[in-house]
């Protein structure tokens, strides 16, 4: 655990004026379950530019626009859109975000569904031997989203750009 913490603190990019807001997922939770260690809290304590928002799900307000960070835990489905669609459908209307950033599946995908702009966030690591043995896809990359809003935070225009980090 200490090596992982040290690696994140030393290697994760740091740029003046930019904060990274992050959540943890199911693999990170294993540290909590097995050793009682919350690596998210430890990272945020060491890096003032990194804001830990908790485990699995968090909402961030960017002005009046609500952005939800969500880390799933189920396996990949037959279609990339399926898990996002089912997740958006179960969010109560009063809680619905304008933008959903969904991790865990190591794939990239973008769609607008039920008035939510949905991004499946890819991996930033190479495919693991375990994922390879299961025949799971692993895309490396990131999204940049350029959007405009009205005075209520509703999205008027959205221009997604995928950055492919494939070797």
Question: Which residues are covered by each model-predicted region?
Answer:
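Residues that act as N-cap/strand-start positions at coil-to-secondary-structure junctions
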Residues: 52-56, 139
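Flexible, charged surface loops at secondary-structure boundaries
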Residues: 14-16, 61, 92-96
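Core catalytic region of metal-dependent phosphoesterases/phosphodiesterases
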Residues: 1-52
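Conserved beta-sheet core of the metallophosphoesterase superfamily
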Residues: 66-161
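Charge-rich, low-complexity terminal tails
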Residues: 24-29, 34, 148-167
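Short, solvent-exposed polar/charged micro-motifs at secondary-structure junctions
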Residues: 32-33, 61-65, 69-70
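Short, well-structured alpha-helical interface segments that form or flank functional binding sites
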Residues: 3-7, 34, 55, 95, ...
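Short acidic-hydrophobic surface loop/beta-edge motif
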Residues: 56-63, 111-113
